[in-house]
From Swiss-Prot:
One of its GO terms (biological process) is light-independent bacteriochlorophyll biosynthetic process. This is Aerobic magnesium-protoporphyrin IX monomethyl ester [oxidative] cyclase. PANTHER family: MAGNESIUM-PROTOPORPHYRIN IX MONOMETHYL ESTER [OXIDATIVE] CYCLASE, CHLOROPLASTIC. The gene is acsF. GO terms for molecular function: iron ion binding; magnesium-protoporphyrin IX monomethyl ester (oxidative) cyclase activity. The keyword NADP applies.
Length: 353
């Protein structure tokens, strides 16, 4: 076992501290507005979700076994670097949720909402801690206390928190379950034991998403009028960010036996099917122009990275122009026709994928 790199200066912590359009962010919100939330319109289903969260089905699941003693240095260099990036990014996303949910719970008195965020912060802390223990075993743990104090926070109105975190939880479920099912079909590709934990792990993400779906369905105005435009924006932003990010890990997806486009289509399809429970609009992920636009965003992202490495006057000029091209491409993607969706009477779903 490698001695852990010291303090806030270790490489994993620096990776987690990065603030780019592609990295997980930390959020804060209007706590007084959160305190005024009312779930009476969805009370029956709300109580059922809360009963599941209260039961804490995964309280004994996140325990490492001797399998986790495997040295990451045994992996090929490119795969090791990309797997580490995957773990740090996942940890940052989980811990971001933990910090936000814990702060909401601390700052409000509404018993329904307070209990929800207590349970969700519990789960996210457990997930982040599990990943960090794996990193620590290999001397690359993230300093979570330093991260909490130093990471920049982005303010979002509650409705934007709902749109973004609902998608984050549900797409997290889709990502984990897709990898888990691939490992079921191809156990020879399981290069790390963490994947065996993904099935029950992703059920936590699914339950969290169910709670956010109910919060939105409890306030119908969040899902109507100009808010449909915001929903479309968040859908596109989350899908596009995921696509660009996944193509930055070719060795990781080659090891899984799933090309990034194939993986992304599966995740997008699951997420779209699930989001029918709450979103009145859906992206047309079967439109060839959608994938052409994602490819263009990916190429621009790669060009920005090359310009940064190039440096000098030309590199600086490119870094000024290329984000404008990315914004224009995103705008064109946003203008593609969306699909309308009639919301179902029964909101809750089961993780059946």
């Amino acid at each position: 076992m490698i001695a852990m790199e010291g303090g806030s200066g270790n490489i994993s912590t620096k990776m987690a501290l990065e603030d780019t359009i592609l990295t997980p962010r930390f959020y804060t919100t209007d706590f007084a507005a959160m305190d005024r939330l009312n779930v009476d319109l969805v009370r029956r289903e709300w109580d059922a979700v809360m009963a599941e969260l209260r039961a804490d089905h995964n309280r004994k699941h996140f325990v490492r076994t001797p399998e986790f003693d495997k040295d990451l240095n045994e992996l090929p260099e490119a795969l090791r670097a990309e797997f580490k990036d995957f773990l740090v990014s996942s940890l940052t996303a989980e811990f971001s949720g933990c910090v936000l949910y814990a702060e909401i719970k601390k700052r409000i008195t509404n018993p329904d909402i307070r209990e929800l965020f207590q349970f969700m912060s519990r789960d996210e802390a457990r997930h982040a801690g599990f990943i960090n223990e794996i990193l620590k075993d290999h001397g690359i743990g993230v300093d979570l206390g330093f991260l909490t104090k130093t990471k920049k926070y982005t303010y979002f109105k509650p409705k934007f928190i709902f749109y973004a975190t609902y998608l984050s939880e549900k797409i997290g479920y889709a990502r984990y379950i897709t990898i888990y099912r691939q490992m079921e079909r191809h156990p020879e590709r399981q290069f790390h034991p963490i994947f065996k934990w993904f099935e029950r792990w992703c059920n936590d993400e699914f339950r969290h998403g169910e709670a956010f779906a109910l919060l939105m369905r409890a306030d119908p105005k969040l899902l109507s009028g100009y808010n449909k435009l915001w929903i479309k924006f968040f859908l596109l932003a989350v899908f596009a960010t995921m696509h660009v990010r996944d193509h930055m890990r070719p060795a990781f997806y080659e090891a899984l036996g799933m090309p990034p486009d194939e993986y992304d289509m599966r995740v997008f399809r699951i997420t779209s099917e699930i989001s029918r429970q709450v979103f009145p609009v859906m992206l047309d992920i079967d439109n060839p122009r959608f994938w052409e636009g994602l490819k263009r965003l990916r190429e621009i992202s790669e060009a920005i990275a090359e310009a940064k490495a190039q440096g000098g006057i030309m590199g600086t000029l490119k870094r000024a122009v290329l984000p404008l091209k990315a914004a224009l491409t995103f705008g064109r993607l946003y203008m593609l026709p969306a699909k309308n969706n009639e919301l179902p009477r029964e909101i809750r779903l089961q993780p059946a994928w």
